């Protein structure tokens, strides 16, 4: 449980890092968005696949926590920019 919380917080930190560094110039927005969506879909596929989940449950839950933190952090940054 502690690893999932740490990975969620690491995902929030990573999203803040991605939003401030790579979008500074505006050139990386398309590539960064494509990589984030691909990473999100790969982690979702792995975490909801029953065969893989039975064998590596703890590692997959950690990656899923990172994914949740990343998306939540991006949502928070968008909310800050919108207000």
UniProtKB/Swiss-Prot annotation:
One of its GO terms (cellular component) is chloroplast. It is found in: Plastid, Chloroplast. Keywords: Chloroplast, Plastid. InterPro entries: Uncharacterised_Ycf20 (IPR007572). It holds the Pfam family DUF565. The keyword Lipid metabolism does not apply. Although originally identified as Cyanidium caldarium, these sequences derive from Galdieria sulphuraria. Belongs to the ycf20 family. This is Uncharacterized protein ycf20. It comes from Galdieria sulphuraria. The gene is ycf20.
């Amino acid at each position: 449980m502690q690893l999932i919380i740490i990975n969620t917080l690491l995902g929030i930190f990573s999203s803040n890092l991605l939003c401030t560094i790579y979008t500074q110039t505006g050139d990386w927005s398309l590539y960064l968005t494509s990589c984030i969506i691909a990473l999100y879909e790969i982690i979702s596929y792995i975490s909801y696949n029953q065969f893989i989940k039975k064998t590596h449950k703890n590692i997959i839950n950690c990656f899923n926590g990172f994914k949740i933190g990343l998306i939540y952090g991006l949502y928070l940054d968008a909310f800050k920019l919108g207000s």
